[in-house]
A protein has these predicted regions:
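Glycine/Thr-rich phosphate-binding loops that ligate phosphate moieties of nucleotide
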Residues: 1-41, 60, 85-133, 141, ...
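Gly/Ser/Thr-rich active-site cleft segment
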Residues: 10-12, 136-270, 380-387, 412-416
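Stable alpha-helical structural segments in soluble proteins, enriched in small hydrophobic residues
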Residues: 65-77, 187, 276-279, 414, ...
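Conserved phosphate-binding loops in N-terminal lobes of ATP-dependent enzymes
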Residues: 16, 29, 77, 81, ...
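Phosphate/pyrophosphate-binding loops at sites that engage ATP/ADP/AMP, CoA/4′-phosphopantetheine
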Residues: 66-85, 170-173, 219-232, 257, ...
Length: 552
């Protein structure tokens, strides 16, 4: 009798559920649904305006999409719920919310419905940069050893800066919140009926590590005396490892989704990290870039080596027995969409419509006619700040070399190239610090839909690129974790390595570097590095001064 697992992938804008045969890997059904409130970065549903760099979500959206997507894949596949042995999920991170001790989000409570700090702070909420800057200064002053495991800087995207922002700006929300929790863990709480904390989010976004736990109470007291016991008061020291079972589906959640009560639920994982088993990566030196609105770079190693500017290195962070490094770029697909939404003449839309192609494809067709360097443009890919390797949300984008002859497709291609240069910066910093990058894989929407961009990346990094063979790679990865939560006795797997080997897959198509393009891109990358260091490492802080004027 065939057995199945469901993987649920919570992205930035939508949720995807996938039902898969745990032995054959056959994908029987997929369901995708956008969040009703999407990303709230200008105002709350009430109309209350938000400040600069805010990005919120409504947790009710997460429950609503589950009520639709899980029943949908069960119905489509026509499988018996009795044969669905496991459920896994991944989520964006650090995406966090304040809740009561029973799990009720504060934004569900009437008196907080108009309070922005009561809502979910999405991963790309960057309004806690002031708190992140202070945290880094204090950590350096106190010689905190754990800081070097995060590239020497904590990001404004992470849990503690976001909670500290709440304490500074809305202390009544801080006081009312019994727990401050990752959305991934909150969803499992709704599924299983009890609070859990996963090692992936805690390790990469919460400053926890397997060996030493969290930073000391003394450190948190130095941030703010009110935060001295923040870990015990708002978080938890009980951290569950990846690849294990978080709990079982409750009767209430079973009734809501059509799953069987008692179905195994996996410890959740971050939405980027979950792609690693989905492409079958199990060896050190294999890097995976998950390319969507942003890009996250995952790399496995047998060694723990501090690397400046990365997002973190966590023991067993993806697979047991290996260190998993994370780096990333916080604006990739968002760059391209910004350009489409704001910078194209109507004539381009008219011509695309006439040809019967979407506007991205229309622009790419124009870009493909040009060779590297032909436009004379170099851009800095910082439209949403910088994650790796500068870790600075106060930096902004730049386009150099425009003339009266510059065309929209030139700018579009320069933005694509800039994101490729950013990935090469990340690869170079790993290698310079003794961490091998031997092979490169890509997953996510861009890798599936955009051959031109993938060829540019292969040329810029001068490495072959293998592509994930699953349009819903995040959901497939989550299904693998779900099958492992069930275990071999129930028809799943006892090891993530076994699950990845059986179900992970890549396409036959490989993008190989084109030597003449590599030579040209090496020259362009040298120019990118000059701009990167000049504007990003303090020689000229004009971007920060402009942002201060904008926000004054």
């Amino acid at each position: 009798m065939a057995k199945y697992a469901i993987g649920v992938d919570f992205g930035t804008l939508s949720c995807r559920a996938l039902l898969v045969d745990v032995k054959t890997g056959e994908e029987l059904a997929t369901s995708v649904l956008d969040y009703p409130h999407s990303v709230m970065d200008e105002e709350l549903p009430s109309g209350k305006k938000l400040g600069a760099d805010w990005a919120l979500q409504d947790p009710q959206d997460y429950l609503d999409v589950l009520k639709t997507t899980i029943p949908d894949v069960i119905k489509q596949s026509e499988v018996n719920a009795e044969d669905i042995i496991g459920l896994g999920l991944d989520f964006t991170a650090c995406t966090v919310m304040p809740v009561k001790k029973d799990g009720t989000p504060l934004c569900f409570i009437d008196k907080f419905k108009d309070e922005p700090h009561a809502y979910v702070k999405l991963w790309k909420h960057h309004a806690a940069q002031a708190q992140a800057t202070k945290l880094n200064e204090i950590a350096e002053k106190m010689n905190q050893d754990w800081l070097k495991l995060y590239g020497g800087k904590i990001s404004s995207e992470w849990a503690i800066p976001k909670l500290w922002q709440i304490l500074d700006e809305a202390p009544e929300v801080y006081d009312e919140a019994d727990r401050f929790i990752e959305a991934a863990d909150w969803i499992v709480w709704q599924m299983c009926g009890h609070e859990i904390r996963n090692s992936c989010c805690a390790g990469y976004k919460g400053m926890w590590n397997k060996k030493n736990g969290y930073p000391s109470d003394e450190f948190f007291k130095a941030l703010d005396p009110r935060m001295e016991h923040v870990i015990d008061e708002k978080f938890s020291r009980d951290i569950l490892p990846l690849g294990s079972k978080a709990g079982e589906v409750t009767a209430e959640f079973a009734a809501m989704t059509g799953l069987k009560e008692g179905t195994a639920v996996a410890v959740p994982i971050i939405d980027a990290h979950v792609f690693v088993p989905a492409v079958g990566i199990t060896k050190p030196g294999e890097m995976l870039a998950i390319m969507g609105t942003s890009t996250c770079h995952m790399l496995l190693s047998e060694e723990e080596i501090p690397v400046p500017g990365i997002s973190g290195v966590v023991a067993d962070g993806i697979l047991p027995g290996l260190y998993a490094y994370e780096a990333g770029q916080c604006c990739v697909g968002d760059h391209f969409q910004w350009f489409i939404d704001n910078c194209l003449p109507k004539s381009y839309y008219d011509e695309a419509e006439k040809q019967g192609v979407n506007i991205h494809k229309f622009l790419r067709q124009k870009c493909e006619r040009k060779k590297p360097g032909e436009s004379g443009l170099v851009a800095l890919d910082w439209w949403n700040g910088v994650r790796s390797v500068l870790v600075d949300a106060d930096l902004s984008g730049m386009m150099l070399g425009m003339t009266l002859r510059t065309k929209p497709e030139d700018i579009y291609r320069a933005l694509i190239e800039a994101t490729a240069y950013g990935t090469r910066m990340i690869i170079d910093v790993f290698r310079e610090n003794g961490v091998d990058v031997n092979s490169f894989y890509a997953a996510g929407g861009i890798s599936q839909k955009d051959p031109m961009t993938m060829q540019i990346y292969a040329d810029v990094i001068n490495m072959p690129i293998k592509i994930a063979d699953c349009e819903q790679g995040g959901a497939l990865g989550s299904a693998i974790y779900g099958a492992c939560a069930a275990g071999a006795q129930k028809g799943g797997y006892d090891s993530l390595y076994d699950g990845a080997a059986a179900l992970g897959k890549v396409k036959d198509k490989v993008y190989y570097p084109i030597p003449e393009n590599v030579e040209l891109y090496n020259k362009l990358f040298d120019e990118y590095k000059i701009l990167h260091d000049y504007f990003g490492r303090g020689e000229n802080n004009v971007m920060k001064r402009l942002k201060e004027l904008k926000n004054s």
